[in-house]
Amino acid sequence: MRDSTGAGNSLVHKRSPLRRNQKTSASLNKLSLQDGHKAKKPACKFEEGQDVLARWSDGLFYLGTIKKINILKQSCFIIFEDSSKSWVLWKDIQTGATGSGEMVCTICQEEYSEAPNEMVICDKCGQGYHQLCHTPHIDSSVIDSDEKWLCRQCVFATTTKRGGALKKGPNAKALQVMKQTLPYSVADLEWDAGHKTNVQQCYCYCGGPGDWYLKMLQCCKCKQWFHEACVQCLQKPMLFGDRFYTFICSVCSSGPEYLKRLPLQWVDIAHLCLYNLSVIHKKKYFDSELELMTYINENWDRLHPGELADTPKSERYEHVLEALNDYKTMFMSGKEIKKKKHLFGLRIRVPPVPPNVAFKAEKEPEGTSHEFKIKGRKASKPTSDSREVSNGIEKKGKKKSVGRPPGPYTRKMIQKTAELPLDKESVSENPTLDLPCSIGRTEGIAHSSNTSDVDLTGASSANETTSASISRHCGLSDSRKRTRTGRSWPAAIPHLRRRRGRLPRRALQTQNSEVVKDDEGKEDYQFEELNTEILNNLADQELQLNHLKNSITSYFGAAGRIACGEKYRVLARRVTLDGKVQYLVEWEGATAS
């Protein structure tokens, strides 16, 4: 909902309840002007108690009052109309005309006004700009004309709105002209590995802050992110985290924006709507019929389902429920934590990944990113060594966790492993042993929805976990696997799983004789050789398998707490003087009811 409030003749919006977390201050001095000259360090032109307009992460301006000023970080602490508080960078704050008689340029803070770089006054906010300081440069014809001229900030303030910017009218045409150039240099932005956040907090045509996982579009050419409120090509308002678009910005197209909707599948619809519900209601589980389907039907047009658009409303629930049950590594049922079976939620709260080529190259970085979380709960950052191991393992586990059928040979291995009467509890716990430095069970890390979620949730079934575990061992000894025959692997890998379990040694020998009836001497030799290879591969990451086997009891603690669904995190690892490996585990403190 928009609200026009007069504040310095600018259009402002009432703050929504959604808050963005305070971010690290940016190194703004590295940004360059469009003419290639380095920008001067901005002088502080703000005062405590001053009413200003602050641009938020949705691209809109909100009215607030400055309470504190941090010159070192170039930011102001602002209290908004709804009593919310936040630090805002100077670059995202707009002030009205100063009361003093001196007119200075808003950009360079200089007073001179000489051709061909004269001072031009905005007819909306009363701020002054040099012709060459403003982006884009102000043409000399504007000075001689009697027509009203609006600065870049005022053009965006009067045209941007929720659901998309204005498409018609003189201000809309002025916005299209402004969007041909950016007020910053894209080359100077310092991006993360997944190209989703930058240090300068500079996005879109407006140069303001942004959150890629909310309502933003990424240009498939320059990879910059753009606010929903600033683009003029949308026919319907966006959903949170909806990236199923092929989008080209006005800068790359040298004209109007290009937008094309990508096809959706039922699993994408279920994932996208569950993600939106979790953002809106701040909870994880939703009734599949009363809440999820109600949201899907109410927002059916905003989903742009394409080929699925003609599906009758009475048949939609059947398709959605099938997707929820088929993609168990993506969706979590309530029965897994002893709740009602018709409750569903996302295992990892991240937006769905679009299937277009532009995002395929980003799948790997996104799977290991830790940039965003909506709950505001801190997430531990794994070490670089464990992250590299995780990447290698997730690549292998990914093929078996997205619902795609495994190959005939892999299926044979899984079947032989599933035949073992292993304790379901011990099987589901074992995958976390491979990566003790990573977080065992948190929702804070933003993994890709297509990656294996076994490491982050403790409610996966025994068959799924066994499949993921086999994938891990195959990934760890991938370089040596090619030199072995296929017959030795089905025998060696289940044997390795039993040695790492918690069943008695005698029971393991009995099960081994039932499953594998080949030459035992040859099998033992292959196991010892395989075990040695895995230990050698893990030596660089200091994750020795024998240490883990000897410290299973110390690592897991009370098995009953895990069986009840209590979540935990591994905080630290140490080696005692007598060579024992111990882990510091943080329990959530409450079991699932």
Curated annotation (Swiss-Prot):
Residues 1-24, 357-410, 444-486 are annotated as: Disordered. The keyword Nucleus applies. PROSITE patterns: ZF_PHD_1, ZF_PHD_2. Polycomb group (PcG) protein that specifically binds histone H3 trimethylated at 'Lys-36' (H3K36me3) and recruits the PRC2 complex, thus enhancing PRC2 H3K27me3 methylation activity. Regulates the transcriptional networks during embryonic stem cell self-renewal and differentiation. Promotes recruitment of the PRC2 complex to the inactive X chromosome in differentiating XX ES cells and PRC2 recruitment to target genes in undifferentiated ES cells. Required to repress Hox genes by enhancing H3K27me3 methylation of the PRC2 complex. A zinc finger (PHD-type) spans 102-157, 201-255. It comes from Mus musculus. GO terms for molecular function: histone H3K36me3 reader activity; methylated histone binding; RNA polymerase II transcription regulatory region sequence-specific DNA binding; transcription corepressor binding; zinc ion binding. This is Metal-response element-binding transcription factor 2. Residues 360-374 have a biased composition (Basic and acidic residues). Associates with the PRC2 complex, which consists of the core components EED, EZH1 or EZH2, SUZ12, and RBBP4, and various combinations of accessory subunits including AEBP2, JARID2, PHF19, MTF2 and EPOP. Forms a dimeric PRC2.1 (class 1, PRC-PCL) complex consisting of at least SUZ12, RBBP4, and PHF19 or MTF2; PHF19 and MTF2 stabilize the dimeric structure which enhances PRC2 interaction with chromatin. Keywords: Chromatin regulator, DNA-binding, Isopeptide bond, Metal-binding, Nucleus, Phosphoprotein, Repeat, Ubl conjugation, Zinc, Zinc-finger.
